[in-house]
UniProtKB/Swiss-Prot annotation:
One of its GO terms (cellular component) is cytosol. This is L-cysteine:1D-myo-inositol 2-amino-2-deoxy-alpha-D-glucopyranoside ligase. PANTHER family: CYSTEINE--TRNA LIGASE, CYTOPLASMIC, CYSTEINYL-TRNA SYNTHETASE. Keywords: ATP-binding, Ligase, Metal-binding, Nucleotide-binding, Plasmid, Zinc. It catalyses: 1D-myo-inositol 2-amino-2-deoxy-alpha-D-glucopyranoside + L-cysteine + ATP = 1D-myo-inositol 2-(L-cysteinylamino)-2-deoxy-alpha-D-glucopyranoside + AMP + diphosphate + H(+). A motif ('ERGGDP' region) lies at residues 188-193. NCBIfam families: mycothiol_MshC (TIGR03447). Catalyzes the ATP-dependent condensation of GlcN-Ins and L-cysteine to form L-Cys-GlcN-Ins. Disulfide bonds: none annotated. It comes from Corynebacterium striatum. A motif ('HIGH' region) lies at residues 49-59. A motif ('KMSKS' region) lies at residues 290-294. L-cysteinyl-5'-AMP binds at C47, G48, I49, T50, T62, N85, I86, T87, W228, G250, S251, D252, I284. Its EC number is 6.3.1.13.
Amino acid sequence: MHAWPDPSVPAVAGTPVPLKLFDTADQRVKEVDTTPDANGEVGMYVCGITPYDSTHLGHAATYLTFDLAQRQLLANGHKVHYVQNITDVDDPLFERAERDGVDWRELGTSQINLFRSDMEILSVIPPCDYIGAMESVDEVIAMVQQLLDAGAAYELDQGDIYASIDATEQFGYESNLDRATMEEYFAERGGDPDREGKRDPLDALVWRGHREGEPAWDSPFGPGRPGWHVECSAIATNRLGSHFAIQGGGSDLAFPHHEFSAAHAEAALKVERMAGHYVHAGMIALDGVKMSKSLGNLVFVHKLSEAGHDPSAIRLAVFAGHYREDRDFSDAILAEAEERLTRWREQLAGEVSEAEATEVVDKLRAILADDLNTPEALSLLDGAAGDCNQIIATALDGLLGVRI
């Protein structure tokens, strides 16, 4: 599946600073392992959308977070192999299509196209591999077979196959949650703890046997379709190898999705840890209230763009808060971002020496390399009044994706 056009990302002046990010598994900020893989690249996998509804600013904020991370790596001279999936076969998609009386494939295609447009508007660097679940069914089948062969999965009635949480000793390391919280989140976030016959309530579905009215693919263990978590396990490791640098997504994916996608890959491939970093972006609220379709308070990127808001201002509004925090979005925050952008553009006429400009860029690099500290970065640039010459403007584009 094709992604969206690649924005021009300029080279950045100044001295590279190793990127450090907060790792959910280790519960600390640590340096990203940028040891290149066999292809000379640093691997990053970010979970994509389930295309059953319009993507909103909360989704966009997650992808802007990892766009920032990629920009710091690129500015440091690394080649990044970025992979993103699309869960284009899943229950929420089928349910929404049935509710609206449309074909689930058509619904998925329309929402994927809108997502692509949003990402292009925001100058998000596209993934090298943009992979739909339907494209990767053969890869999932192969991984499920590996789990069965390893004794890490078992079959129940109706052709359903589950992966055992005790297949790896390290299960639970990624999210650091206690058992009670795991069970609560598993039930709330797509799990089926009460499924009769399961060896453990937390065992996750990796293959759903065919039900009437649902799409299905042939496999050695019968017709059916992939489970949610194992899709990401297969897509990521088939492109980035059994171990890669960054697994990312929103904070709501830390458990169960990222815990299980790691566990499935580790059990199938017999590795201790799938990703060096598990990185999670906080949620976005509108005027202090979490964005929710039921509340009717979703903010859509394409609507902001149609209303004439500058994409660089939208980025600055999101970057006003730290990526790991649950944070607010409001008309006032967007207006402040637009004022900031206008002020910076006016400063472009300022004349400073190359040495002075490079000093500002070096400070900006160091701040962003420290767990993507955008609030401090914006403060630095606000304080550089009159110093925003072309060297700094280019750094803003390269490091923040903000065009002056």
